[in-house]
A protein has these predicted regions:
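Conserved Class I S-adenosyl-L-methionine
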Residues: 136-138, 213-240
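A short acidic, Gly/Pro-enriched loop at the edge of an enzyme's catalytic core
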Residues: 156-167
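Core SAM-dependent methyltransferase catalytic element
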Residues: 248-277
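Conserved class I S-adenosyl-L-methionine
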Residues: 87-96
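S-adenosyl-L-methionine
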Residues: 127-158
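A short glycine-rich, Lys/Arg-flanked "PGG" loop and its adjoining helix->strand segment in the class I
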Residues: 105-106, 182-196
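Conserved beta-strand signature within the Rossmann-like core of class I S-adenosyl-L-methionine
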Residues: 197-206
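Class I SAM-dependent methyltransferase Rossmann-like catalytic core
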Residues: 53-79, 85
Length: 277
């Protein structure tokens, strides 16, 4: 009897192990083919950009320094592509000085909410941290909650599980690699915070196809690496946009705005839209 029980348990363990192996293999196969299966969409026709997005971007009281970046960042296109709407609860991960945070705040409006997250700022980036803190003092951004928390901390976002509509990370996923952050933990936290059907939007400077993370010091990352890692968290890639593509960029120079100088805003960038099932 005991031998039968042991044999049964061993057989069950083998079957369970095989099921996990099969699931991981399926995920790997899915991740390796998804990019090709999701063609990039063309820019959204201006007439199809919602008026509330145009109003937010063109608001007279937006900072002039923000507006000077618009041509290189195409915020109307990005916000429309991500489906940002009034009343939504959203998060801006690694918000930096708050350019994207303010746009999100203006679009979601008084019935919406924005979590603006930044990790601790090292000494050389204290000026950005100060700009972020100063921006959030604006009464017009009272729907924004500042989240000063390391990516490795538990409870990255204070939002209740399954409560957010959209999470955005704008040109900073590569920095997770540079700082040695546990990206699987970050993506899992985003997955937990989003509601079913919620969107995870990622924009970043592209490295050459197939380069993986070897060019990370250029502040660039291979698009497929991001796709694979985010899908491993359970997300499905549903859309890609070409609006920030710059084929003239040979992807050999440092994309960081602190180094790019006059070339800032001209990097070849991918925009990925993932959805939580």
């Amino acid at each position: 009897m005991q031998k039968w029980i042991v044999s049964f348990l061993l057989a069950g363990g083998v079957l369970l192990l095989l099921s996990f192996v099969k699931m991981d293999w399926a995920r790997a196969q899915h991740a390796s083919t998804t990019r090709a299966a999701v063609p990039e969409s063309a820019p959204i026709p201006p007439a199809q950009i919602p008026q509330y997005i145009r109003d937010a971007v063109n608001a007279a009281d937006r900072p002039a320094t923000d507006k000077s970046l618009d041509a290189g960042r195409q915020p109307e296109q990005l916000l429309a592509f991500l489906g940002i709407q009034p009343g939504m609860k959203v998060a801006d991960l690694w918000a930096g000085g708050g350019y994207t945070t303010e746009l999100l705040s203006r679009v979601v409006g008084p019935t919406g909410m924005v979590y603006s997250q930044n990790p601790p700022f090292p000494p050389e980036f204290q000026q950005i941290g100060q700009a972020w803190a100063e921006r959030l003092k604006n009464p017009a951004l009272k729907n924004v909650t500042a989240v000063a928390k390391s990516f490795d901390a538990d409870g990255l976002l204070p939002a209740p599980p399954g409560s957010l509509d959209v999470v955005v990370m704008n040109m900073n996923y590569h920095d997770l690699v540079l700082r040695g952050v546990d990206r699987a933990k970050v993506n899992a936290a985003v997955y937990q915070a989003l509601k079913s059907g919620g969107v995870y939007g990622l924009v970043d400077h592209s490295a050459k196809d197939g380069s993986g993370i070897k060019d990370i010091e250029l502040h660039r990352i291979d698009e497929q690496v991001v796709i694979n890692e985010v899908q491993q968290a359970g997300f499905t890639l549903v859309a890609r946009s070409s609006v920030l593509r710059h084929p003239e960029d040979d992807r050999t120079w440092v994309a960081s705005p602190r180094v790019a100088g006059e070339r800032r805003g001209t990097t070849d960038r991918f925009i990925l839209l993932f959805r939580k099932p």
